[in-house]
Amino acid sequence: MAFSASALSVKTLGALLLVAADLLSAQTAPTHGVRPRRLAIRGAMVVEGNATPAEGPKDIIIEGNRIVQIVSLDPAAIRNGTARRPPADVEIDASGKYVGPGLINLHGHVQDERAGLAQPLEYQFKLWLGMGITTVRDVSSETPKTLQLRARSLAGEVMAPRFYVYARYAYMPVPRNEAEARQRVRDLKAQGVDGLKLFGMDKDVYGPVLDEARKQGLRVAHHMAVDETNALDAAANGLTSLEHWYGVPDAAIPDGVQHFPSNFNYADEGMRFRLAGRLWREADPAKLQDVLKAMVKGGVAWNPTLDIYEASRDLQRAETQPWYGEYLHPTLEKFFRPDPSNHGSYFANWSSTDEAFWKENYRIWFGAVRDFERLGGVIGAGEDAGFIYQVYGFGLIRELELHQEAGFPTLKVLQHATANNALILGQQENLGRVRPGYLADLVILNGNPLEDLKVFYPPRADAAAGPGGGVAWTIKDGIPYDAQRLLREVRELVSTAKRSSSR
């Protein structure tokens, strides 16, 4: 059968158009780990990060490492091909996907070893990026190493989130008077840190440390111990953020100190955390409200890290998390086993009675956190992973679920991990929102996080809710990362490490 010239030309033209379309698609597809000159995220539903409702479809245009334009689109115009779309060199099709600010982890620890065993930083960083975490406030890791990582991350030399380095204040010798305390703050400032991390504090040096930090332009995170200082001292002296919950219920106990048994030893972590589960019940409700109001008035933000103590209320859940098989590195697995030499591994002889007290603890704690925000306080979100059965990245997503359990609307939960965390960092003009002029730190999700926060977790074929969800792309500083590729590489890394450790 002979073909006519006109038929042949039409078929040839059609084939050429298909080839051209394939070439165009190949030219505009993002390259993992490479920042394009101009990137478009097409047709996304956008959750801005400021607790306003999702809106879309929208095109988000990025030039270099900044968002430069966000265009609202008419769905009908998209369907009939008449929508005016801003041009770009590279495109990500986000149709049916949700885009939000990259998550900020306000309480992270860069860890290259656990339980005396080396642990690759690649494992930690890829988990963070793979679950949409683009910024980490590192609180008291090895400062010189973390400062180097901060610089390398900003330069795009390492596949990692951006870091804000909060150095440990109380390294040896610990300052014992005002002059030494102020000098320590100045010394840390000279190293180039972004802030300070405090553990416990004596009253006579607490005020001078926070005063000197303000003079040096340093923000301060405080993990309070059972010590002289509490949340009222933080409020009076202008602390930036109170970590965990230490110091809040303590300040509301009528007698000024928890009713410890006579044999209590604070250095015994099993005893310490067992009694911590009985603390919130001793706080006077009316006095607790006064403490929360004082924190709000003093401008103290609260980063509760609800996730890191959850094993205390349900140990079996913590020990059997479904992603452990593929994502738990052998070094972490060893560190998590009950062992008094490993901080937070205190679960020898943990009982149902301990869990019952901790469940009550959480109920009161949830209420205090909710009241704090309703009074005008700023709530942040951080994971403190690498301890107490929490794996990097997974810990922050669990933190968001616990904020939801505490009663916060999901829009507010996401605000805690984005715009609020940026505010606590002093980066509210650069981070935490999907907005023109802001840094291009974004997460593109295969699902609606307002319906189910579990879309941040890696997809699982055997999940009861089905295999959907997961982060499609994480964009940090304008660099797109294929999140599922990162997580696949983590699984391979863990599998290799397990084989090596079993030899």
Give residue spans per PLM region.
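Histidine-rich, glycine-flanked metal-binding segment
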Residues: 29-37, 46, 50-100
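Active-site neighborhoods of metal-dependent hydrolases
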Residues: 188-194, 248-406, 494-503
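Active-site gating/metal-coordination segments in enzymes
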Residues: 168-216, 264-282
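C-terminal cap of metal-dependent C-N hydrolases
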Residues: 439-494
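Divalent metal-dependent hydrolysis catalytic cores, especially in the metallo-beta-lactamase
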Residues: 124-144, 160-168, 189-201, 210, ...
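N-terminal signal peptide c-region/cleavage motif recognized by signal peptidases
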Residues: 20-21
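C-terminal helical cap
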Residues: 44, 348-357, 362, 367, ...
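Metal-associated gating/positioning segment near the N- to mid-region
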Residues: 84-89, 94-157, 173-179, 232-247, ...
